[in-house]
């Protein structure tokens, strides 16, 4: 790969247009079209899930969790591909380190790639790299968060990390109807968010379950942030959305019901899956701002054939892509 010391300049050229030209706001209601399954797990694997994706040199770079056909979870990336239709033939590369439910981004202030995850040495951990395409080129684990939460069967789960000009924020769930937040000054990142967090959203367990993601909405007249959270509904998994004008502020429900969700069976257009589950909005930049272009909203998600129910670990999740109508 080329020298990443040139990355900030390259990124500024490559992604300046979407930031400047985005003149769309977030819709008040969402309606999508969906692909079918974009890829099948390679031999020996039963599922592909928990997707995190960034634009990289004009292509897509995706990391994910897999489960084998036995009893083990693992982590992987896909080889680079230019179009989502090419995901089916991209290489599937197992990692020697386990980075379940990953979050991938480029931390521009320190010129380093970050892969954050759960089930590591601490509650949340992270790895660093200068070449994110190499599934096994990452550093040893470092602590990202060392705290715990109460009233949760799983403990902390499904982190995401995002920054503004001064502060880095950690958001996470607990499969318990709550969303949590921690923060640190941006000049101290990458590092440990510590042990303390605050509850920023609270509801019934199924309404705020897991898979929280937070994004900067590009091209707006004022700072706008979008949060999506996976919920459990009568018709399957779906995403609710919330908005805020600061990452450290309060969050307002936007498309937050199963009948009118951010994305779910009611509006996905998908015919192969009832679940619209853990994934990532397609970002316009790879950096810590987690920026999305509201003129071109797409959601990379995990779906599955609802007629197949072999038990949670072996549920046959596959990647799919929603595109806003």
UniProtKB/Swiss-Prot annotation:
Record keywords: Carbohydrate metabolism, Glycoprotein, Glycosidase, Hydrolase, Polysaccharide degradation, Secreted, Signal, Xylan degradation
An example molecular function term from Gene Ontology annotations: alpha-L-arabinofuranosidase activity
GO BP, sorted A to Z: arabinose metabolic process; L-arabinose metabolic process; pectin catabolic process; xylan catabolic process
Reaction equations catalysed: Hydrolysis of terminal non-reducing alpha-L-arabinofuranoside residues in alpha-L-arabinosides
A family per Pfam: Glyco_hydro_62
First and last residue of the signal peptide: 1-22
pH dependence: Optimum pH is 5.4.
Protein's cellular compartments: Secreted
InterPro entries: GH62_arabinosidase, Glyco_hydro_beta-prop_sf
Temperature dependence of activity: Optimum temperature is 47 degrees Celsius.
SUPFAM superfamilies per the UniProt record, alphabetical: Arabinanase/levansucrase/invertase (SSF75005)
Function: Alpha-L-arabinofuranosidase involved in the hydrolysis of xylan, a major structural heterogeneous polysaccharide found in plant biomass representing the second most abundant polysaccharide in the biosphere, after cellulose. Releases L-arabinose from arabinoxylan.
Similarity-based family: Belongs to the glycosyl hydrolase 62 family.
Protein name: Alpha-L-arabinofuranosidase axhA-2
Annotated organism of origin: Emericella nidulans (strain FGSC A4 / ATCC 38163 / CBS 112.46 / NRRL 194 / M139)
Species lineage: Eukaryota, Fungi, Dikarya, Ascomycota, Pezizomycotina
